[in-house]
């Protein structure tokens, strides 16, 4: 497997891999990673569909990319997905997956046209004082110390950031900047999250720094991620004869190490209450989704808080399977699951879905986002953060294009909200969010969008239906780590197995993204089948001088460097540098970026 860039490799079709007709594949998990692995086995590996088996414990494919309606409780959306124009593997996949809504076009075409006609951007990024615009005004407000610390983090080798928290590499002044408000609420980082992962994010998305304050860098699907992404991919695979076997609770993969050649020999699973096995030969390829950020999700509804009695550090079936596999390693080559699942107080947050058709509530929404959510277009354009809830629930909410579900009533609006601090009291509801019913969570949200307090209780009870989801491991992959804590996609010496998903290690890319999961799926197939075509490399904006200069300009709130407060020595050095670059292409680049006038 090798990486490539450019259209030469991207547009080419690889030759059929040697002996692929003799091979079979068993894919554990049907999240984006597993479905993508199956896609590349079919399209580029040219494996027969009937040789590909997807093993899924649940009754529905999609993993964490779900979206569903419970006929007794209402709509549930555990989370949403933000996409980027440089999700290279994602778009390589969906350019060949037919749309299930628009005949004759691909999912990518449909998505591209949608976001061209209805581009995403926010008109209010944050509020204070019950729905008033916080006027972040697209500014980062980075002080010099914070800006220098971010620059240092950007340039620090990953090895030097292993097992470090963000709070260990950034100054106290950073936490009060707009940059941190944007960053934390958009990506769900915490101060105790991995400094290594924050560095990866900075490097990966430096080309989008101008679109960070108003989300103009983002693109969204038409419907929820299940109907817009998972379902078309499942239909594609089924059309090619791929089998999805539901109710398959995989407990272990037995791996034998034969003088450094590591061979998966058996899959152990439970089906219909009985333990069974699948015996494997070297031509049977196994793709293992190790760990799951939505494991042990706890659901609540309008009148019930989620039951958290089963939440314990390290508890969860996906972690149990990974631990069983990791215990077979001689030198830790299958990762260290305990690093990610042993502190639910650090890794949890909670989301809720509010369904309403109430005109009065919708008017309060429109006062903030300046758009009518019933028009079928971008509404909030990303999350609206309640800035004065930072020391409380730290609430953010969003309304994507409506309807979010094809079955949704045309007058209904679905609001998704989430809280980073589930253990703290709300500003209005004096309870921890995790202890609240859906109705109580709705009250807190109504308070923050400006509904008068005397109307809140009645509207939350009679005009809204709120479902909730507490996720103890949703931020597990943000835990401080070292490279070896996640297994390589294909560990050294592995003959017929790979790890895929958010807890497999691949260079440079960032977790908590659709692209990361899909990339591991592609890399695993290309490695095990030795497909002779390049895997598109992670977009290299951190290596592009033009992008870096542009990022500097926006990071200092669109000011020329001459307007920055500098010491006498720094001013003298700047004069020397400007004299050296005068009349060169460097001067032109500095002018184009806005750093000099």
Task: Describe each model-derived feature in a short phrase.
Residues 203-285, 289-291, 303-304, 309-319:
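Helical element adjacent to the flavin cofactor pocket in flavoenzyme catalytic cores
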Residues 1-25, 43-51, 69, 551, ...:
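Extreme N-terminal leader/targeting segments of oxidoreductases
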Residues 13, 19-149:
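N-terminal glycine-rich phosphate/pyrophosphate-binding loop and immediately adjacent elements
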Residues 104-112, 246, 533-543:
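Short, glycine/acidic-rich hinge or "gate" loops at secondary-structure transitions
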Residues 100-207, 219-220:
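Rossmann-like flavin
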């Amino acid at each position: 497997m090798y990486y490539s860039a450019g259209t030469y490799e991207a547009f080419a079709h690889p030759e059929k891999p040697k002996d692929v007709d003799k091979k079979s594949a068993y894919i554990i998990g049907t999240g984006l990673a597993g479905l993508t692995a199956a896609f590349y086995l079919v399209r580029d590996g040219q494996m027969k569909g009937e040789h590909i088996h997807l093993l899924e414990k649940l009754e529905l494919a999609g993993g964490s990319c779900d979206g569903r309606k419970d006929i007794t409780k209402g709509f549930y959306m555990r989370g949403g997905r933000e996409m980027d124009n440089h999700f290279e593997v994602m778009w390589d996949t969906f350019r060949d997956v037919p749309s299930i809504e628009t005949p004759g076009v691909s999912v990518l075409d449909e998505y591209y046209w949608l976001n061209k006609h209805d581009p995403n951007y926010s008109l209010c990024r944050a509020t204070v004082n019950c729905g008033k615009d916080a006027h972040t005004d697209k500014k980062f407000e980075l002080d010099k110390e914070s800006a220098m610390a971010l620059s240092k983090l950007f340039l620090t080798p990953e090895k030097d950031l292993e097992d470090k928290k963000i709070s260990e590499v950034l100054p106290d002044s950073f936490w009060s900047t707009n940059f941190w408000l944007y960053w934390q609420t958009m990506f769900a980082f915490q101060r105790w999250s991995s400094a290594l992962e924050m560095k990866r994010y900075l490097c990966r998305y430096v080309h989008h720094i101008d679109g960070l304050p108003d989300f103009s860098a983002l693109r969204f699907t038409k419907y929820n991620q299940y109907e817009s992404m998972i379902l078309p991919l499942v239909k594609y695979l089924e059309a090619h004869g791929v089998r999805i076997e539901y109710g398959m609770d995989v407990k272990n993969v037995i791996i034998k190490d034969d003088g450094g050649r590591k061979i998966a020999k058996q899959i152990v699973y439970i089906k219909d209450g009985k333990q069974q096995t699948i015996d494997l030969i070297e031509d049977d390829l196994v793709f293992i989704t190790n760990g799951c950020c939505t494991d042990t999700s706890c659901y609540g509804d309008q009148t019930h808080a989620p039951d958290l009695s089963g939440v314990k550090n390290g508890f969860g079936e996906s972690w149990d399977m990974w631990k069983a596999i990791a215990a077979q390693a001689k030198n830790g080559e299958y990762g260290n699951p305990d690093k990610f699942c042993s502190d639910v107080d650090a890794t949890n947050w909670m989301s809720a879905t509010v369904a309403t058709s109430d005109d009065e509530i919708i008017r309060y929404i429109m006062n903030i986002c300046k758009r009518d959510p019933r028009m079928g277009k971008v509404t909030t354009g990303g999350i609206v953060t309640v800035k004065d809830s930072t020391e409380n629930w730290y609430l953010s909410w969003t309304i994507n294009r409506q309807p979010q579900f094809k079955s949704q009533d045309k007058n209904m609006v679905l609001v998704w909200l989430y809280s980073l601090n589930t253990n703290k009291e709300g500003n209005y509801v004096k309870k921890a969010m995790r202890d609240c019913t859906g109705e109580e969570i709705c009250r807190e949200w109504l308070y923050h969008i400006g509904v008068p307090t005397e109307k809140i209780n009645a509207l939350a009870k009679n005009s809204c239906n709120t479902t909730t989801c507490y996720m103890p491991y949703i931020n597990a992959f943000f835990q401080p780590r070292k490279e070896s804590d996640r297994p390589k996609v294909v560990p050294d010496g592995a003959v017929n197995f790979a790890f895929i998903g958010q807890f497999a290690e691949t260079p440079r890319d960032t977790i908590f993204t659709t692209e990361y999961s899909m990339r591991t799926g592609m890399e695993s197939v290309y490695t095990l089948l030795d497909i002779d075509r390049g895997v598109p490399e992670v977009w290299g904006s951190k290596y592009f001088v033009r992008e870096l200069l542009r990022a500097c300009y926006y990071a200092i709130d669109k000011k020329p460097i001459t307007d920055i407060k500098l010491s006498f020595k720094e001013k003298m050095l700047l004069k020397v540098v400007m004299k050296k670059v005068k009349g060169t292409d460097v001067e032109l680049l500095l002018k184009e970026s806005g750093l000099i006038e």
